[in-house]
């Protein structure tokens, strides 16, 4: 497993997002995908759902990138999960607001079969940017977002979370 820090990525996104971009990104394709997963600490099922896909993607020649601003991946969990340690890259200590930019840049490179990013709520523009980047880079992107427990108290339906045992 490799760990690295990323500096904020700034670019002109107007070249990626045009008036027709929404149609192109939302059209069914066989290359690239962005999915948002809202998860709860009390329900570790998302890890079990994602693990087979991550194991399959680990068989590709490309890297698996984890953009985790606050957390450090557990080496023990990676070993026990069957993910290829030599293909896992973790970028930490990223400003959470810069993580969207880092995720977009990583998806665009085509060097990663999957990019998992722990991100705040996305704007529609951010979603479009990430979908386009995933499509162009032929990669999977998983936007991981912790469940806001106060919203749960206000009647929002319970959703799944990746359990914190994945981290030190």
UniProtKB/Swiss-Prot annotation:
Post-translational modification (record): Is rapidly cleaved and degraded by the Lon protease once DNA damage is repaired.
SUPFAM superfamilies: P-loop containing nucleoside triphosphate hydrolases (SSF52540)
Pfam families listed in its UniProt record: SulA
Induction profile: By DNA damage, as part of the SOS response.
Keywords: Cell cycle, Cell division, DNA damage, Septation, SOS response
Region ranges (Lon protease binding): 161-168
Stretch list, region FtsZ binding: 106-112
Cysteine pairings via disulfide bonds: none
Marked site (Essential for degradation by Lon protease) residue numbers: 168
Any one of the GO BP annotations: SOS response
Function per UniProt: Component of the SOS system and an inhibitor of cell division. Accumulation of SulA causes rapid cessation of cell division and the appearance of long, non-septate filaments. In the presence of GTP, binds a polymerization-competent form of FtsZ in a 1:1 ratio, thus inhibiting FtsZ polymerization and therefore preventing it from participating in the assembly of the Z ring. This mechanism prevents the premature segregation of damaged DNA to daughter cells during cell division.
Family: Belongs to the SulA family.
Assembly notes: Interacts with FtsZ.
Name the UniProt record assigns to this protein: Cell division inhibitor SulA
Taxonomic source organism: Yersinia enterocolitica serotype O:8 / biotype 1B (strain NCTC 13174 / 8081)
Gene coding for it: sulA
